[in-house]
């Protein structure tokens, strides 16, 4: 085969490779900051496509979407335009774990995001496959496509997803493919490891079969409707845009059973996961149905949610039934389940293996340590999930854009955002399996709530140029309204006689002395609307999201203060920087494992070093003293 002749294409400030959820955010962020940006994708019909679950949000993930929105990203706005159902999860629990989840019209989501990208003045969308990078003296200067085009740029972002040497597996069948039977990118990650010496890993994920909604017996399943109370992901979407419950699409709940499990057990010898065909490591928190049956053999049933894929399709997603079993076995499994006895399978489930850049090779900015001006994001970094990908894509795009503009990078700390938690986990601890964000990963989750993402991050987004002045002024007004109402409640006193009957009706003890309105609101049986029965309403008609903040900040004030004190202590450690070129071999007293881990990950602060597995408190003490005593003469020249 003759070699493709190369030619010089246009020059850009930023090039983003891959237009999934990470790439879309990265390209929009870079372009909106004033950079001439090129977004390359294998297939223009796959921009921001949802090859797996047709949903956005959920525990921890929904908070990330709010954070993306507060920073000026697009995912929240896009799902607000294209959802078919909206639900707030964990409403019976505390505010730290509440999260919004939307059922998406996956085709509308893709089309709307593509339209947004095409309308962005500084952004060029182009179909093509990137095979290699242009690297000179360790600096990335652009990309080379399989058609021979050489595009020069000041910085490059790779968001390759599962297309990176992707391989689909269904039973005994396996073939090279990206997600949803799209084309795989075969050369780029091969060059990353062979030419640029990146350490790659092989991960696996999977997807369930899709069934024809017209063949589901819904009478045998349990309806899961959306919420009546308005909620959106974007802080800019008004309640008036909320879809009435009667116009939302329901999901439906069913279960596997002993017959299902028997079919799976009888065919385990044909399951690629157990036959040795699958080499990649799969996600712990989203196992295949065959893996569940083996790992949780004592369970008599597993939940399955039947989810619509959109308003203009009859395809339904069977959440919880991810599998790579042979096609005919998948049909048997489906027909053993209540409500799916006559279901027609429209697409079989499959497993897909793909390449991952081991994330210890990244900085907190998502720039690679091996090649300057090269950034990576999304599943390329070992994460799973659209939301995790979009969060990383936004940060990578911001930092690639700021590098092109000659500005300092943005880094989010663990105490700033779930996005900061995720990136710190990846670059500090690495991951040996597809990484999923969980509320339990965030030690400051009471501060990192879905309801206060704008209060945490809008200022940052505005400073970056991603949040408009109009949006910022609306945010400042909301912030002032919260402050004013909290102050007002701290100045109003309530007499015991005013609330005696109310407290008796709640089965609560009465007051002996008068209390401030803020103290009365702190009681668990009292909400803001109850409080207004005993005091004057504020002069201004407050938005419900202002009232929500007033309630949360009042009721959880003590816990929030304790969490903030811990954050302040962490910040002092974060301020203790570790010199870039420190020579860990020159530091006497470090344990062998600690020395090896510090050398491999090369943390930038004492706080980050303390979070590395295998680095002991004694190692941290020695390292701190070494830096404090100014023994930097031993830093490698």
Curated annotation (Swiss-Prot):
Keywords: Cytoplasm, FAD, Flavoprotein, NAD, tRNA processing. GO terms for cellular component: cytosol. The keyword rRNA-binding does not apply. InterPro entries: FAD/NAD-bd_sf, GIDA_C_N, MnmG, MnmG-rel, MnmG-rel_CS, MnmG_C, MnmG_C_subdom, MnmG_C_subdom_sf. Its main location: cytoplasm. Belongs to the MnmG family. This is tRNA uridine 5-carboxymethylaminomethyl modification enzyme MnmG. The gene is mnmG.
């Amino acid at each position: 085969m003759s070699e493709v002749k190369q030619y010089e294409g246009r020059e850009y400030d930023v090039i983003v490779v891959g237009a999934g959820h990470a790439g879309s955010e990265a390209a929009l962020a870079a372009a909106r900051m004033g950079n001439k940006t090129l977004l390359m994708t294998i297939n223009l019909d796959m921009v921001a496509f949802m090859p797996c679950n047709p949903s956005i949000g959920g525990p921890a993930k929904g908070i990330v979407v709010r954070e993306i929105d507060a920073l000026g990203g697009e995912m929240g706005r896009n799902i607000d335009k294209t959802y078919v159902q909206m639900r707030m999860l964990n409403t019976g629990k505390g505010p730290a774990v509440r999260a919004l989840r939307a059922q998406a019209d996956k085709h509308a989501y893709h089309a709307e995001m593509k339209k947004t990208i095409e309308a962005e003045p500084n952004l060029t969308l182009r179909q093509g496959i990137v095979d290699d990078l242009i690297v000179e003296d360790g600096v990335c200067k652009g990309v080379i496509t399989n058609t021979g085009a050489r595009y020069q740029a000041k910085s490059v972002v790779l968001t390759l997803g599962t297309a990176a040497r992707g391989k689909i597996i269904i039973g005994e069948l396996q073939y090279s493919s990206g997600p949803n039977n799209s084309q795989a990118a075969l050369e780029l990650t091969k060059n990353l490891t062979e030419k640029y010496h990146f350490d790659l890993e092989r991960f696996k994920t999977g997807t369930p079969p899709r069934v024809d909604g017209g063949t589901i017996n819904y009478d045998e399943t349990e309806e899961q409707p959306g919420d009546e109370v308005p909620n959106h992901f974007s802080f800019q979407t008004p309640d008036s845009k909320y879809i009435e419950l009667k116009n939302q699409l329901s999901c439906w709940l069913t279960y596997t059973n002993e017959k299902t499990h028997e079919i799976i057990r009888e065919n385990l010898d044909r399951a690629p996961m157990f036959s040795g065909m699958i080499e990649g490591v799969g996600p712990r928190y989203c196992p295949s149905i065959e893996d569940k049956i083996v790992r949780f053999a004592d369970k008599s049933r597993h939940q399955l949610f039947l989810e619509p894929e959109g308003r203009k399709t009859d395809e339904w997603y069977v959440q919880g039934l991810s599998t790579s079993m042979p096609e005919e076995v998948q049909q048997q499994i489906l027909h053993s389940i209540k409500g799916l006895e006559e279901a027609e399978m429209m697409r079989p489930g499959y497993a897909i293996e793909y390449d991952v850049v081991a994330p210890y090779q990244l900085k907190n900015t998502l720039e690679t340590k091996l090649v300057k001006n090269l950034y990576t994001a999304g599943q390329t970094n070992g994460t799973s999930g659209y939301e995790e990908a979009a969060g990383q894509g936004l940060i990578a795009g911001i930092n690639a854009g700021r590098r092109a503009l000659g500005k300092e990078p943005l880094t989010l700390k663990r105490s700033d955002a779930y996005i900061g938690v995720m990136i710190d986990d990846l670059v500090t601890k690495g991951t040996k399996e597809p990484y999923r964000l969980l509320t339990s990963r965030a030690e400051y989750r009471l501060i990192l709530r879905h309801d206060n993402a704008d209060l945490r991050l809008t200022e940052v987004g505005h400073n970056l140029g991603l949040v408009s002045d109009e949006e910022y002024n609306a945010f400042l007004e909301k912030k002032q309204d919260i402050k004013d109402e909290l102050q007002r409640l701290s100045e109003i006193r309530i007499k015991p006689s005013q609330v005696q009957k109310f407290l008796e009706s709640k089965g609560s003890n009465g007051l002996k002395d008068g209390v401030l309105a803020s103290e009365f609101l702190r009681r668990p049986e009292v909400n803001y609307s109850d409080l207004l029965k005993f005091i004057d309403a504020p002069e201004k008609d407050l938005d419900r999201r202002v009232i929500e903040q007033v309630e949360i900040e009042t009721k959880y004030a003590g816990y929030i203060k304790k969490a903030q004190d811990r954050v302040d202590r962490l910040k002092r450690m974060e301020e203790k920087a570790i010199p870039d070129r420190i020579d860990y071999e020159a530091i006497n007293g470090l344990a062998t494992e600690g020395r090896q881990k510090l050398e491999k990950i090369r943390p930038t602060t004492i706080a980050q070093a303390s979070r590395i597995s295998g680095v002991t408190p004694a190692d941290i003490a020695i390292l701190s003293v070494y830096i404090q005593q100014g023994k930097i003469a031993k830093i490698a020249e």
